Amino acid sequence: YIKELSHVRGNVPDYRNSFDVAFILLICLIFCYNTYKKWVRLEDLIMLKDWNKVEQPTAEEVDKRLANAKNSLLQQQIAMKEKKLPVIVLLEGWGAAGKGSVLGKLIKNIDPRFFKVAVMDEPTEEEKRKPFLYRHFVKIPEAGKFVFMDSGWMSEVTSQKLSGELSEEEYKKRIESIKRFERQLTDNGYLLLKFFFNIDKKEQKKRLKKLVEDKNTAWRVSKHDRWQNKHYDECMEVYDQFLCDTNHSTAPWYIVDAKDKKWAQLQILETIVQGIDTAFANSALSVPLLQNAFPLKPISRLDEVSLDKSLTDEEYERLLDLYQKRLKELHNELYRKKIPVIIAYEGWDAAGKGGNIKRITEALDPRGYEVHPIASPEPHEKSRHYLWRFWNRLPKTGHVAIFDRTWYGRVMVERLEGFCSKNDWQRAYVEINEFEKELSDWGAIIVKFWVQIDKDTQLARFKERENTPEKRWKITDEDWRNREKWDSYEEAVNEMLEKTNTSYAPWHILESNDKKYARIKALKTVIEAIEKYEAK
């Protein structure tokens, strides 16, 4: 730089001259800025623009390493089943980069009972009426199995951004959703491996031309593929940004040199093998607990709730008729405006949840709602992320889903009965807040009820059920066992209410010693929530 300055000034710089010193400092600042930019890009692992290919081995070396990797994967499948490791392999990349052909070769190395392939084309009309992450979450595998995703959330988001469907603000929300989604998977023991098949513009054009010229493969070339090649640089910018935004240590992106398909297969196969080995080694580690990032509202503890509220029969009948008529009107508006509603019920056994739900559904068009009674998870549900079975039951836009028991079982019964680890249920408060935020951002109205009674009222209702033949089926040994743990459950419920009472999904406590009062309050609360949403 001093030599350059000498050339510009025509003489040797005088370090006592303030102008010379300033000039040298300016050049140093420019140098530091350029170095910083390069450092930031390396730190962020932007891999398309600044991507350096790994030198491709010889054909003999590729064949040898492929054989070793295939043998390793064969042995790992048995251990995966034993250790209950679920693996998601996401394949993204340029059109005609070879994802399909490489995928076909990859799955030949895996027992067909242990994997599924999910081809993520354009969202169906049904999927468009569900939250963005719905169609991706429901595809996750059972413990001990693979899911190979031919495209996924990257293709969906980048396509929408390139077409102008997503504003910059909407794009940022999608990125936050994806980061939460991926973190929840890896925190809950999933191995997530993300690959981007990279080829240059010239190579893509050559492959597309070859496909089009063969009548048996011409159908594989879409309008989007042609558009992508024509706007290669623009696509590169968007893909590059997405890779940067969603690259993190627990689920990094791997850029695959896809010019040679056998070499691409080796890169992926070796990465899968290494990833599984690492997951086995780290399986005993606890996941750090995150701080809640969503503002919480204060809420009363259960022992502070007054349970002496009641209604006369005349008041009850009058208000029931009034509120059910209003809810019926609102249900029509919800369908017309395509607003989804999620009503979640938790509460003590015999608190009156069933009768409460019945009074709400009496006001709804049966074609526009569904009630989901939630019991212990089935084996195929238990072997997936605990929220999976609730993602599967979400309503379409314009419809109502009512949950009799919910995802809050994670921090109540699963916590107290030891069905999950302490780290699992402590982490669940943030995960549930994130889940409900996803639903709220989608546009759902969320109403959560805790149905509260006192211990004496529960005992009286238990005895009534035992002594009434048509109600005897409602009382089980498990109800009596849970009653013995009343104090422990009350402590867990208070913590649940405190840590998940957000502005977008608040809790409402229904004082249900008098069932009539609780039913009317529930109807009124649902109506107010819908009217408040419509007024925004």
Give each language-model segment a name:
Residues Y1-Y15:
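Extreme N-terminal basic, low-complexity initiation segments
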Residues K3, F23-L25, Y36:
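N-terminal compositionally biased, intrinsically disordered segments and leader/signal-like regions
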Residues V12-Y15, L25, K297, L307:
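Low-complexity, intrinsically disordered tandem-repeat tracts enriched in small/polar residues
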Residues D20-C32:
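Hydrophobic alpha-helical signal peptides and transmembrane signal-/tail-anchor segments
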Residues I30-Y33, K37-K536:
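Glycine-rich phosphate-binding loop of ATP-dependent small-molecule kinases
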